[in-house]
Amino acid sequence: LLRQLGIELSEPMLFGLGEGLGFIFWNMKSMNFPFIGGRIKTDYLTQNIAKNLNLELTVKETVSTQKAWNNIKQLIDSGQIVGLKLDCFYLEYFSKPIHFAGHYVAIYGYDHHDAFLVDTIQQGGKVKTSLQSLALARAEKGPMSSKNLYYTLSKTDKNFDLKTAITQAIKNNATDYLNPPITNMSYQGILKTSTEIMKWFHVSKDIENDFRTSAMMME
């Protein structure tokens, strides 16, 4: 999405500009196993990038699967690359699929069967998945999910200074990390996890799989 605007930045740089460093220990009754994350909520990452680079972020949602596809199809046909939020479990190029509805990709094209996406370097960069699987991924309900969320980025009349943006992002990230709103986030969340993790051996129904999945998510 940024390259379309003439902005060339690496994944690590975008993570920093998105004020992405964080920690969360998340457990709900509806979850089979607690979730451990090493970054901020994915929604905020995109918002922070747009804020620090003086870009306009347009986010939309709809409960209609057909409308959700028609909307992004129209944008793609007009030459606009679109960001999508979805559950990566359904993406056919994932070698080890797990349910995580806070995953983001960019879609830049499609044909009668497949959608052409850009994912992280870890997941292969330029990839494809069937239109059917994409629809399932976008409409999935559950923790961290949204209603077929999609977004676009556009330039404003304000240019950005990268050095200033980096400095501000680091300050903001440090401030948020040192002042978590609840005790299961940031450094307080790490402390809480250190005590809660010992209980997992007694509550997990599949210790090997649950611990392996947790480690993979952190990586």
What positions do the PLM features span?
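Conserved active-site-adjacent core of cysteine acyl-enzyme catalytic domains
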Residues: 2-9, 20-158
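Helix-coil boundary and N-terminal low-complexity module in membrane systems
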Residues: 15-16
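Noncatalytic regulatory segments and standalone regulatory/sensor domains
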Residues: 113-219
